């Protein structure tokens, strides 16, 4: 008997999520994790590190509720959006009995989180234009307790039709929780489904400070939902989920002055995205630049592997999507600074 064989069988067979950092590389330009290209400057204001943190940091809860336009009863603070995903699966799905459903190509952590919890996964691929296939979803809802959708979708960058999300909420009412992952919503805030919370008690929204707020290293996310759903999740979440320093910096990030700064910097990044998309379109190696509402672009190349490898060797680290469903020869490029975008274009231009 070895340590490995003592572990659960599903864990022995598990292929872990391949995060950008785990994939590594020796880059000087990191455009593979959808991080903001520059870091904000905050200073820790508290020194009470000898005390355990609050179960839920109330100043952060209040600040995010104000920002999102909801009540504090609608907010649960989590260790990044990923903990929110895991928490919902653990709370609502019986292992080896219930299933989640998601629509690839999409964020890989839905599948990994279900697998580690011993929960089944069902998939209904997106349509050719990366939208929900509602008839097929309806046909696959047996035993499904949670449906995950991502809008803007990672890695494709497009928005799901809000009318389709509304239809999804209607066909799942009384049957399953619908989770809308809005990790990238700050880049298109008008597309949020937060206005649907009051009418759909089975809707949960995932948010994060990792993207537009440029705080990926903080690991601070949120679940937004009706009070009953939040109360149930609160039974399961760890007793001290948010470290004191993380709560301190998150509260500073959510002050009105910094939110205004984030919104201004977001406009600058969107300008860089527009420039990058136009510049990539004219390159001989690039066959298509997909429309994006997020801080990244998905491109289809004549030879995606050659482009990815050539830039990797120059220290420009992108995200290879070649093995992702329907994304052969595709690469995801995080929108960086204008200088970084220019270097990406020049490097791809040189690929033969």
Swiss-Prot record:
The record ties this protein, via InterPro entries, to: Aminotrans_II_pyridoxalP_BS, Aminotransferase_I/II_large, HisP_aminotrans, PyrdxlP-dep_Trfase, PyrdxlP-dep_Trfase_major, PyrdxlP-dep_Trfase_small
Query: What GO MF annotations does this protein's record show?
Result: histidinol-phosphate transaminase activity; pyridoxal phosphate binding
Q: Which CDD domains match?
A: AAT_like
Organism of origin is Haemophilus influenzae (strain PittGG)
Tell me the enzyme class: transferase
Q: What is this protein called?
A: Histidinol-phosphate aminotransferase
Q: What is its EC number?
A: 2.6.1.9
Pathway listed for it is: Amino-acid biosynthesis; L-histidine biosynthesis; L-histidine from 5-phospho-alpha-D-ribose 1-diphosphate: step 7/9
**Reactions catalysed according to its record:** L-histidinol phosphate + 2-oxoglutarate = 3-(imidazol-4-yl)-2-oxopropyl phosphate + L-glutamate
Q: Which family does it belong to?
A: Belongs to the class-II pyridoxal-phosphate-dependent aminotransferase family. Histidinol-phosphate aminotransferase subfamily.
Q: What keywords tag this UniProt record?
A: Amino-acid biosynthesis, Aminotransferase, Histidine biosynthesis, Pyridoxal phosphate, Transferase
- One Pfam match, given by its short name, reads Aminotran_1_2
Quaternary structure, from the entry: Homodimer.
Alphabetized HAMAP family for the sequence: HisC_aminotrans_2 (MF_01023)
Where are the N6-(pyridoxal phosphate)lysine modifications? 211
Cofactors, names only:
pyridoxal 5'-phosphate
**Which Gene Ontology BP terms does the record give?**
L-histidine biosynthetic process
Q: Which PANTHER family match?
A: HISTIDINOL-PHOSPHATE AMINOTRANSFERASE, HISTIDINOL-PHOSPHATE AMINOTRANSFERASE-RELATED
Chain's gene name:
hisC
């Amino acid at each position: 008997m070895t340590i490995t064989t003592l572990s659960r069988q599903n864990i022995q067979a598990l292929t872990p999520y391949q995060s950008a950092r785990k994939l590594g590389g020796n880059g000087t330009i990191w455009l593979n994790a959808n991080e903001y290209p520059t870091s904000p400057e905050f200073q820790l204001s508290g020194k009470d590190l000898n005390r355990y943190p609050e179960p839920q940091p109330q100043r952060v809860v209040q600040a995010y509720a104000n920002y999102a336009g909801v009540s504090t009863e609608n907010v649960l603070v989590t260790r990044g959006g990923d903990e929110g995903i895991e928490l919902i699966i653990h709370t609502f799905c019986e292992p080896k009995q219930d299933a989640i459903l998601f629509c690839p190509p999409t964020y890989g952590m839905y599948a990994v989180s279900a697998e580690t919890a011993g929960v089944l996964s069902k998939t209904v691929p997106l349509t050719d234009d990366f939208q929900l296939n509602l008839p097929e979803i309806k046909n696959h809802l047996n035993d499904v307790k949670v449906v995950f959708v991502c809008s803007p979708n990672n890695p494709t960058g497009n928005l799901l039709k809000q009318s389709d999300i509304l239809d999804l909420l209607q066909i799942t009412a009384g049957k399953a929780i619908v989770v809308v992952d809005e990790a990238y919503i700050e880049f298109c805030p008008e597309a949020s489904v937060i206005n649907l919370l009051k009418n759909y008690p089975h809707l949960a929204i995932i948010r994060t400070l990792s993207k537009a707020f440029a705080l990926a290293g903080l690991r601070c996310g949120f679940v937004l939902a009706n009070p009953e759903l939040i109360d149930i999740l609160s039974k399961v979440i760890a007793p001290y989920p948010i470290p004191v320093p993380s709560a301190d910096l998150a509260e500073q990030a959510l002050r009105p002055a910094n939110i205004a700064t984030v919104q201004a910097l977001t406009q600058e990044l969107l300008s860089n995205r527009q420039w990058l998309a136009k510049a990539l379109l004219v390159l001989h190696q690039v066959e298509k630049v997909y429309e994006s509402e997020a801080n990244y672009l998905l491109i289809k190349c004549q030879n995606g592997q050659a482009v990815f490898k050539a830039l990797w060797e120059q220290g420009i680290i992108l995200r290879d999507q070649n093995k992702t469903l329907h994304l052969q020869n595709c690469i995801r490029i995080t929108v960086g600074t204008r200088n970084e975008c220019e270097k990406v274009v020049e490097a791809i231009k040189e690929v033969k």
